[in-house]
């Protein structure tokens, strides 16, 4: 499965680890993703999605309506 958040669209970014000696090593920065089961009240069913930590915070504040609209 891809490492992309369903709600926010966050995906891996590429950059450099820089040492004290200023050596650059290419690296991949992964988003903070979690696989969650979320109850969608409108459809009366559980949905399994990959969400970032920020997306979980958005859902807890605004509810699952935004997520249900994206999954249709």
Curated annotation (Swiss-Prot):
<dbReference type="GO" id="GO:0003735">
    <property type="term" value="F:structural constituent of ribosome"/>
</dbReference>
<dbReference type="InterPro" id="IPR034704">
    <property type="entry name" value="Ribosomal_bL28/bL31-like_sf"/>
</dbReference>
<dbReference type="GO" id="GO:0006412">
    <property type="term" value="P:translation"/>
</dbReference>
<dbReference type="InterPro" id="IPR001383">
    <property type="entry name" value="Ribosomal_bL28_bact-type"/>
</dbReference>
<dbReference type="GO" id="GO:0005840">
    <property type="term" value="C:ribosome"/>
</dbReference>
<keyword id="KW-0689">Ribosomal protein</keyword>
<comment type="similarity">
    <text>Belongs to the bacterial ribosomal protein bL28 family.</text>
</comment>
<keyword id="KW-0687">Ribonucleoprotein</keyword>
<dbReference type="InterPro" id="IPR026569">
    <property type="entry name" value="Ribosomal_bL28"/>
</dbReference>
<dbReference type="InterPro" id="IPR037147">
    <property type="entry name" value="Ribosomal_bL28_sf"/>
</dbReference>
<dbReference type="GO" id="GO:1990904">
    <property type="term" value="C:ribonucleoprotein complex"/>
</dbReference>
<dbReference type="Pfam" id="PF00830">
    <property type="entry name" value="Ribosomal_L28"/>
</dbReference>
<protein>
    <recommendedName>
        <fullName>Large ribosomal subunit protein bL28</fullName>
    </recommendedName>
</protein>
């Amino acid at each position: 499965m891809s490492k992309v958040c369903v709600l926010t669209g966050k995906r891996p970014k590429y950059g450099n680890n820089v040492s004290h000696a200023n050596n650059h090593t290419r690296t991949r920065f992964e988003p903070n993703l979690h696989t969650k089961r979320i109850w969608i009240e409108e459809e009366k069913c559980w949905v399994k999605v990959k969400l970032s930590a920020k997306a979980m915070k958005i859902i807890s504040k605004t509810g699952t309506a935004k997520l249900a609209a994206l999954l249709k």
